[in-house]
Swiss-Prot record:
InterPro entries: GET2, Get2/sif1. Required for the post-translational delivery of tail-anchored (TA) proteins to the endoplasmic reticulum. Together with GET1, acts as a membrane receptor for soluble GET3, which recognizes and selectively binds the transmembrane domain of TA proteins in the cytosol. The GET complex cooperates with the HDEL receptor ERD2 to mediate the ATP-dependent retrieval of resident ER proteins that contain a C-terminal H-D-E-L retention signal from the Golgi to the ER. It is a multi-pass membrane protein. One of its GO terms (biological process) is retrograde vesicle-mediated transport, Golgi to endoplasmic reticulum. This is Golgi to ER traffic protein 2. GO terms for cellular component: endoplasmic reticulum membrane; GET complex; Golgi membrane. Residues 19-86 are annotated as: Disordered. Its main location: endoplasmic reticulum. It comes from Debaryomyces hansenii (strain ATCC 36239 / CBS 767 / BCRC 21394 / JCM 1990 / NBRC 0083 / IGC 2968). Residues 31-48 have a biased composition (Polar residues).
Length: 303
């Protein structure tokens, strides 16, 4: 007859009986009693029982099997069940790292540094905005403090100094221009005896032939204007007064404001500075011509 396969219950029962027989042959209880009697100074009234023969108590310490395990015989039968292991010794401790706020912020803001053209334009916009705010604080002198960096404060002071130099040189050359125009006009007015140097509503006065000294007045006026205005242009260009004093011109302020939206406008800033310099010289010439017209009007009223 063929043997019938064993059920799971029968297999467990046979395995349990085999394990108990091996423990009986190995005298595990006697070895355990010897170990406990050697390690303890006080003997109990009852003989200790093997851990394999007694049922585990729920309040037993989990470290006791770990202390006994080195004394167990190193001989192991391949058919024995594996030793019971504490789950605390098998499972590694899971460490949860606390998030570093500074590192997270640096990663977030650092991701925008090496960006594309849009990121660079945004960086230019913010840099221009901060530069204008710092320059405005330095010129007004109302919000400047010692806690700010030295570079923006130095730039604002340099800008204010250049504006002061620009106004100072304009005032000096204005005195020279007015003195030259007045001297030239009154010299010819006093030396010419007839009415050719005066303006009059009468027809006979305008019909008179001009005196030769009238041409010398125009010659001296043109010569003085060229010499004075050329000197003004050379001095201001050499000292870079108009190139550094950007806050003194409304057009340059408009270019700076527009460069925050369209950075390409900064390429035209040197051209705008040069045109502003030319316009300053031309406005001085117009002022001298208007002064001559006013003088002729006053003379005509006097006559």
């Amino acid at each position: 007859m063929s043997e019938q396969p064993l059920s799971q219950d029968e297999k467990r029962r046979l395995l349990r009986e085999r394990r108990q027989a091996k423990m009986a042959r190995g005298k595990a209880s006697e070895r355990l009693n010897n170990i406990l009697s050697q390690g303890s100074s006080v003997k109990g009234t009852t003989d200790p029982v093997s851990v394999f023969d007694s049922k585990p108590e729920p309040t037993a310490s989990s470290t006791k099997p770990a202390e006994v395990s080195p004394a167990v015989s190193s001989h192991r039968d391949p058919e024995d069940d594996p030793d019971l292991m504490d789950i605390d010794n098998v499972t590694p401790e899971i460490k949860v790292d606390e998030p570093n706020i500074d590192k997270m912020l640096s990663d977030i803001f650092g991701a925008n540094v090496g960006g594309n053209a849009t990121d660079s334009s945004q960086d230019d916009f913010m840099a221009n905005m901060m530069n204008m705010m710092k320059q405005g604080e330095g010129v007004d002198g109302s919000t400047g403090g010692t806690a700010e960096p030295q570079e923006p404060g130095y730039q604002s002071q340099l800008n204010a100094y250049n504006i002061y130099q620009q106004r100072l040189w304009k005032f000096r050359f204005s005195i020279i221009r007015f003195a030259a125009v007045l001297t030239n006009f009154f010299y010819h007015y006093l030396t010419i005896q007839d009415y050719s140097f005066t303006s009059s509503p009468h027809f006979y006065v305008r019909a008179l032939a001009p005196h030769p000294a009238v041409n010398s007045f125009i010659t001296w006026f043109s010569t003085c204007e060229v010499a004075i205005l050329a000197s003004f242009y050379l001095i201001t260009s050499k000292n870079n007064i108009y190139a550094n004093a950007s806050d003194g011109n409304l057009l340059l302020k408009g270019i700076s404001m527009g460069a925050m939206v369209l950075p390409q406008l900064r390429a035209y800033q040197p051209l705008v500075i040069r045109l502003a310099h030319y316009w300053e010289v031309f406005s001085m010439l117009l002022g001298d011509i208007f002064l001559v017209v006013v003088l002729f009007g006053l003379v005509s009223i006097y006559n």
